[in-house]
Amino acid sequence: VGSPLNRNSKRLQTVRNSNDSRLDRSLGLDENITRRDFLNSTLLASAGLLLTAATPAQLLAQKAQTSAPDDFNGFGGIGDYANSNGNTASVLEAGHRIRDGEFENLPASIVETGETYDCVVVGGGISGLAAALIFQQLAGKSKACLVLDNHPIFGGEAKRNEFLVDGQRLMTHQGSAFFPVPYPHSFIARFYESIGLKAPRLEYQKWGGPGPEMKLSTTPYLGSAPNGTYFGAKFGKPEGMWLIGEETWERAPIPAKTRDELMKFESASNSEAHSPRYPGDAISRRLDSITLEDYMMERSGISRETIRAFLSPGEGAGYGLGPDALSGYTAYAADMLHPLDISDETGQQMFPDGNGGIARLITKTLIPESIAGEHSLDDVCRKPVNFGALDRAGAAVRIRLDSTAVWVKHEGDPAKSDFVTIAYTHGGKTYRVKARSVVMAGGSWTTRHIVRDLPADLVEAYSQFCRAPCMMANVAVRNWRFLYKMGISGCQWYEGLGNYTQVRKLAMCGAHAPTIGPDSPTVLTVKVVYPYPGHPTEQQGHMGRAELLSTSFRDYERQIREQFSAMFASSGFNAARDIAGIILNRWGHAYLSPAPGFFFGKNGKPAPGDALRAAPFGRIAFANTDLSGVADHRSSIIEADRAVGQLLDQVLSG
């Protein structure tokens, strides 16, 4: 029968479960809408597993035994990308087999394809696609190139999510977002023109009302469009408090000392005395020797506690972690590498699916039949992918999807070898191809494992590439009148999941409707990063990944619905009625997080990016945006161009 204590515990648990069920229903978790096509969800991993520091692979194995098939991936949307929302469980499992040493030796059952290519590109993100295109442009179509991509569709983090909401097809980005208008005579401008992006300033939706026009951003980032700041229970405001307009900190429910520090920090300017004049000068090298947090404290007198409470991860979100984990040079690295206008007024441009539009344009240029229709922005954005055209025998360039490279090694001495062996998994089997040259355009976290004869100095270089996870949660809402009623189109907050969201008007090349207004359906993106201030940079990445991978779709969905309800219910928002769908894009290694010493080296050794860029290793050259230290698709393209040039000049020229 059990003790009275146990009976009471069971009764309390029954009441709690009943209350939870009622709350879930009020939030819309059991509504039959497009957010998911399954009913049962359980947590991916138990608290006990987390406390024993389980690896991501163990967490996924636990999930496979105890959870519904979609408990991790959740609803993936509609269209070509429906089964490729972020790193899906199958992509993660394939990658973790590499990390866990399953391919230290190739299996006896390996399938010999008999294929030999002039160039194999490992990685089908923007860097890999750009490498294939540049190889084709420079080497000619008589040379054969194969791109191996581990996802169900090309693009890497430059992919889209699509929803169908009240008859309107909505499109948004999974990761890589905007592109600045390039200098007209720059390499990037010439590259854009070569893929059909000849007029990089896009046309956007117009205001359609009803009601007075509200300024809207063209990107998902807070800028000059009207926005507000929310303070909730964490700040002694259980009913919520909104501050809209100027002088937010002056009115915020925070201690006077904190208020003064934040106001002083915001008013501080980057004087020339603080700013590097060129990469590698004395100022930039000193900044690279300290953390961004130390630099912020030194420059404006702000305390460590205030930085971590209000400016983390905001000041480091472009690198995935907070200022305590990053090199001080990250304050300037992007502007020094790409000194362009990125204002939301004139500089930032964005396809409806973010830089997925760039990836699609490159692919259409490589393989004209890959996307239906003409080579126009409108058709490339709107028309479906012809998957059958991607990997056709005899084509100059082939893109092989769902193919995870697990082994890259020279045949014999790298200095004398004529070929590189590449093994990859696909459909439960392992296959082998040969190449006269290889571009490693995937992420540093896989390249370091799969290049089997990588020399010690490059192994050491790759050990300095720390990566942080990110989740892009895309929330489709039937309208955004709840924001319009408050006089805002975006907002930020300092508690809960993520820290900002923004309504944006879409570029016309992919927008369903020519106008937008408060009654229009839209997608609100919530970017979630996982800083653990005070821990070493690499450890923060591991801790963040454990959190990202151990949380079920349903649990994240509940958090999003609760948070939106807390913030917006007072202006008429109803989660069960107004949320039409949620897609989670989990990126386990989304951002390079450069620790001090990454950009210019330390202890007399070169910067890791410089070591990998200097020359090919045998017949292998290295690309990917990682090497630049700046997560930017332009860096991906520039690194691809350098890698292909090295191979053509130093490896394939004989």
Placement of each model-derived feature along the sequence:
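Glycine-rich active-site loop/strand segments that organize a redox cofactor
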Residues: 74-79, 155-186, 322, 328-341
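N-terminal secretory signal peptides
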Residues: 1-37, 62-63
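Conserved flavin/dinucleotide-binding core of flavoenzymes
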Residues: 65-108, 162, 476, 482-654
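Rossmann-like flavin
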Residues: 194-333
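Glycine-rich FAD pyrophosphate-binding loop
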Residues: 136-161
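Beta1/beta-strand and adjacent pyrophosphate-binding region of the FAD-binding site
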Residues: 113-125
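Mid-domain catalytic core of redox enzymes
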Residues: 397, 401-525, 529-534
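Active-site/ligand-binding neighborhood in enzyme catalytic cores
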Residues: 267-403, 414-417
